[in-house]
């Protein structure tokens, strides 16, 4: 089983290089706090908040996966050069249809050099 790296609040870290490493590999979820059952709901996942990630042929974000708890909802895959071979924030918009009473959204980003990185969970109330 591969190791899953988890986001650490970079404001609590002293070394700039470590802040950069953690932030640029971490997925960040942006969405509304509430959703309507059986209606489209948009979720944006951005790799990195303050720092950008490389897009080199051997070091890039290969995929971003969105989960509701342990249920895989969606996945986007990328090839090297998708972001023009420059450092950037890989941003993916997913549209899902919530059916339960609550969502517990978690995203995974996969870096070809540094493995799987997991976001902080985001809870969404479904009406």
Show where each model-derived region lies.
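Short amphipathic, basic-aromatic surface patches that mediate peripheral association
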Residues: 46-56
């Amino acid at each position: 089983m591969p190791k899953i790296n988890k986001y650490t609040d970079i404001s609590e870290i002293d070394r700039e290089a470590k802040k950069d490493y953690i932030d640029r590999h971490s997925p960040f979820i942006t969405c509304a706090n509430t959703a309507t059952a059986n209606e489209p709901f948009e979720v944006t996942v951005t790799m990195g908040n303050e720092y950008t990630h490389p897009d080199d042929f051997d070091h890039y974000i290969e995929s971003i996966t969105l989960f509701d708890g342990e249920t895989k909802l969606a996945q986007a895959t990328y090839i090297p050069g998708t972001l023009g071979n420059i450092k950037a924030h890989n941003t993916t918009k997913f549209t899902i249809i919530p059916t339960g009473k609550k969502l517990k959204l978690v995203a995974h980003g996969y870096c070809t050099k540094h493995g799987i990185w997991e976001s902080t969970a985001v809870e969404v109330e479904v009406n």
